[in-house]
Amino acid sequence: MMSFSLLSIVSIALAATVSATSDGTNAYTAYPSVAKTASINGFADKIYDQLPECAKECVKQSTSNTPCPYWDTGCLCVMPQFGGAIGDCVAKNCKGKEVDSVESLATSICSSAGVGEPYWMIPSSVSDALAKAANAASATTSVETATKSAAAELATTSDTTIVASTSHESKVAETSVAQQTASTEKSSAAETSRAKETSKAEESSKAEETSVAQSSSSANVASVSAETANAGNMPVIAIGGVIAAFAALI
């Protein structure tokens, strides 16, 4: 009777095993296979090459403070002490999009290992520190952008001022040159007019001198003629006087 009971139990167990294998309800087949080795650890290996440089040293955390095998990705993802150490390091060394990249990769690797939400389990204080690191970089970027924009506007204004000043100086210089040219032309015209007046005066003076000389010459000629005429009359008068004297004596 007892042997029959043992045989029945073994048969039932074998039937259950065959049934479970044939219908595919083995719970372990629902999870991905896990490599039981890692060069760094089960968390870091698959994402290391995609991490920003600031986070690569952070994921090289020791797994000795966890009950997990160092190669077990899923186990490491749910250990706050392990994930928290990585998160603190990232918050101190990375900023902005670098932080976002690390969190995205961590979520992806933990989700792939079969871990449910929130996938990468870290303390809330570490989560806050990561958020501040990301936001601080965004604020810094905004300030830098505003500073660069202001500098660009200042440079543009300065260039405009320089151009305007140069244009003004150029116009002033052109005006000055034009004024000097006009003044020179006026001076030349005045000198030309003076030269003409001087020439006319000299010509008039020469004409007057010539006229005076001609008048003087005419007068001299007339005087000489008169003297010559008088000289011609003198013998006649003298002869007449002699004749009169003789007549008186007789």
UniProtKB/Swiss-Prot annotation:
Induction: Induced by RIM101 at pH8, hypoxia, ketoconazole, ciclopirox, and during hyphal growth. Regulated by UPC2 and BCR1. Residues 1-20 form the signal peptide. Keywords: Cell membrane, Cell wall, Disulfide bond, Glycoprotein, GPI-anchor, Heme, Iron, Lipoprotein, Membrane, Metal-binding, Secreted, Signal. It is a lipid-anchor; GPI-anchor. Residues 165-219 are annotated as: Disordered. One of its GO terms (cellular component) is plasma membrane. Residues 193-209 have a biased composition (Basic and acidic residues). GO terms for biological process: endocytic hemoglobin import into cell; intracellular iron ion homeostasis; single-species biofilm formation on inanimate substrate. Heme binds at D72. It is found in: Secreted, Cell wall; Cell membrane. Heme-binding protein involved in heme-iron utilization. The ability to acquire iron from host tissues is a major virulence factor of pathogenic microorganisms. Involved in biofilm formation. Belongs to the RBT5 family. This is GPI-anchored hemophore PGA10. It comes from Candida albicans (strain SC5314 / ATCC MYA-2876).
